[in-house]
Amino acid sequence: MSEWELPKTVETQSIERVGGGGFAWESGVYDATVKMVYLNQSASEAVSFNIILEKNSGNFSELRENFWIKSGKAKGNKTYYTKDGKDYPLPGYSVANSMCVAVTGESLSKCMESAEKKQVNVWNPELKKEAPTERPGLMSLVGKPVKVAVHQVIEDRQAKNDKGEYVPTGASRTVNQCKFFGNAEGKTAEEITNKEPATRFDKWAQKNTGTVIDKSTKKNGSCSAADIMGSTSTDGDKGSLFQTEPPI
């Protein structure tokens, strides 16, 4: 079995719940193109699946996000976690697998076979900026169309304290979180897998388009995009996604 395949005991769960770079994309459903997908590793040995998407219309802006698909050494370098005696995929693994199925029709494990060494800009802690670095790029995904459900999220900025722990700084930033993916025809990954009609993107968009999820400690709740344009945008976030350690 490939190290990227989930064990048969792992209970997969749906990530396609309707639920309640530059300036962040507003919450909504977008047609995009996969500009790059590459792997990175944190100091704890956790592995991230890093994506760069480009809108197919409008301002053609980029969206960057990373999904943690393997836990660090302290937690066994696993693609899953155990809770109440049952095994479940890491949340990041589920979203990354959703993208792989949507774009290629194949699982994350299969897409790993297309890895090639590529130069990508990765955060360099010594230089304190992004620098060209060789990383495995998943080329079966690059240049392909994808549909994505995106949330705009306000979260705390974090910095290390005297103990080396990341804590909120009191400032916030606006970022994007990809919820799930689909193909160019509008079928989500789960609809493709289960041979179901395309309905989830429309249902999700009706409930979530234009909303903002506020996860910061300064303010909780959800509001419209127009209401939060005064908050810190991703324009000021020129640093990498990998300045902080993963939560796994």
Which positions does each model-derived feature cover?
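Short beta-rich binding modules
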Residues: M1-I248
